C-alpha cells in the first residue's frame, strides 16, 4: 500500500518536478523474475529516483540503525523504511557482509528486484570508484541478471552536506542485462567487479578511480 503511495502521490511528483528525469534503456529491466540493478552512487536521493522510474517494486538493503533509532527522527526513519519494504541489515558484527548477501539472495529467490550501489557509499567528487565484490558474488550464486545503471544529476538535486533539495536535471540510463557464471577463484570475482565499474564510468563519461570511495581523500587525490 505505502510503496505505490510514496511513488505516485507523496514523493514521486516532487522528484519529477525537481529532477525532470530523463530515462534511457528502461526496457532493459526484465518485467518478471529476479534482477539486480547495479548503479553508481552520487547522492542519498539516488535510491528514490531508481524506485521512481523502475516500473517494478525495488528493494534496497538498509542499515539496521534506520530501524532502531531513538526519538522522533528514529521513529520516522523506522516507519518509512518499514512501510517502503526495505530490508534491515546488521552491519556491526563480523558476519555483517554475509548477512547482507543472505538478505539480497532472499529478495532474488522471491523473484524481486534488488538495487545496489557497488561503490558502497556516495562518490565524494562525482567520479566512479572501485566496487565491492558482493554484488557479483550474489549474481554468480543466484544466476540473476545484472542491469548496469548510470545516474547523473542527482548530486545537483541533493548536494552533499545540504538538507535542501534543489532543481536539476537527472539522467538515468539502463544498460543491457548480463549474467555472470560462477567463478572458481576469488580474483575472478574481483576482475568482473572491476570490469562492471569501469563500464559504469565509461557509460557516464566519468573517470574511474581504482580505490574505494570510503578511503577518499586519504588514498586518492583529486585530479
Where are these regions (language model features)?
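Structural motif corresponding to alpha-helix initiation and N-cap regions
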Residues: 23, 73-74, 98-101
